[in-house]
Regions:
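Phosphate-binding and hydrolysis-coupling loops of NTP-dependent motor/remodeling domains
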Residues: 137-202
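P-loop NTPase catalytic phosphate-binding loop
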Residues: 1-65, 75-157, 170-171
Length: 202
């Protein structure tokens, strides 16, 4: 649903990095999507992203030197064309990058560590059952350090990446309906705590 919503925007760069399970194969024929499945595909995409990331990073650092506030930096970066990079399965992607013959882990580590406020976004799915296999990888640690996302399936107590302290113990151990996601750190009583994805129920 998020991917489809992004494609409705006119000026946007979209990339899909799909695992061998081909969960996003429907987008392989989408002209506006860079659909990557092989090591060579992924390497070429990041090779093309490198100069753009460097340019934006220089701009960000210049604004930091000018003691600009984060809101000002973000406002400026929002004038740049956004990049949305969708990864079908983080538990596949991280080992894939580190085992690749073509070296791209250094660049990706740098992007995820320093890429905040660049208007470049990485979106991925992760089954909590596979989380332990990724611990220790710098790409994974940087990815989850942002503490942003949506937890689907209920039983939020099993998710140690996000904080759901605003929920009671009982609520944190309840399963949830298909398509209903829980937002972390929704401490403000007026903030949204759940999202509903209607299409996921079909």
């Amino acid at each position: 649903v998020f991917l489809q919503a992004v494609l409705e925007k006119e000026d946007v760069h979209v990339c899909v990095m799909d695992s061998p399970r081909s969960e996003f194969k429907a987008y392989a024929v989408e002209e506006r999507v860079d659909y990557c499945t092989t090591e060579e595909d992924v390497f070429e995409f990041f090779k093309g992203l490198l100069p753009e990331f460097k340019r934006r990073n220089v701009l960000k650092n210049q604004m930091l030197e000018q003691e600009k506030e984060e809101d000002e930096i973000l406002d400026r970066m929002m004038q740049e064309t956004p990049y949305f990079i969708f990864i079908s399965d983080l538990s596949w992607f991280v080992p894939f990058i580190y085992k690749a013959t073509l070296d791209m882990k250094g660049f990706l580590e740098n992007v995820l560590e320093k890429g905040r406020l660049h208007n470049i976004y990485f979106i991925s799915e992760l089954d909590m059952k596979n989380k332990s296999n990724l611990m220790g990888y710098k790409i994974y640690e940087s990815f989850v350090s942002y503490k942003t996302g949506i937890h689907f399936g209920g039983k939020t107590a099993e998710n140690t990446l996000f904080s759901f302290d605003y929920m009671s113990y009982t609520e944190q151990n309840k399963p949830e309906k298909v398509g209903v996601g829980q937002l972390p750190n929704a401490m403000d009583k007026d903030s949204a705590k759940k999202v509903v994805v209607p299409r996921a129920r079909r």
